[in-house]
């Protein structure tokens, strides 16, 4: 998005709008995650429904319940681990995000090219190369974690630190960084991808809220239209991409 905006700059928008836009439209992708993985992320269920839907949350007779509504402890502890993984990004966002963002906006020697653009270009290539290198290194290893329930708090924190790299360096894929980190510590591709997508739910909602608050809700009609269209397109595209990706990585690696 940062590189595209350099080629096709937004017209008739307020200062700082694009910084907010490229974060907020990702809510469309997060909504796609919620829709596709609802059976795995929603921890409550009706006790009368004894058989879980295929690929849904794990149900147990020991799960606490109020009346006919029970709480899947398996799903509950998954969300606790997601909170642990969010801690590095939350600390960074509150303390350093503004300062780092301003530093990356500085031009290089009056050339009109910002540090941000250079970092984005470098990180796009570097992350792609890392996927190839790490997949080659990982090809003969057997994953030690093949279920979400097997993730430890240590695993969650390491994945959260990988996410921090993506938050600090523009152009670094958040999903790419966390999936690579997860694979390196012995987590299967499917579990790595699922946990990464679930982790994005609170992170991107929080990041979007923070950006909108800083922008001040002072949208023009054009800006509001851009946000709505961008978010809807993000949602539709993500539905297809996520379905394809989850099916693809069950049989293939990320080297393509």
Task: Report the location of each language-model feature.
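Multi-pass membrane proteins that catalyze or facilitate reactions on polyprenyl-/lipid-phosphate substrates
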Residues: 1-256
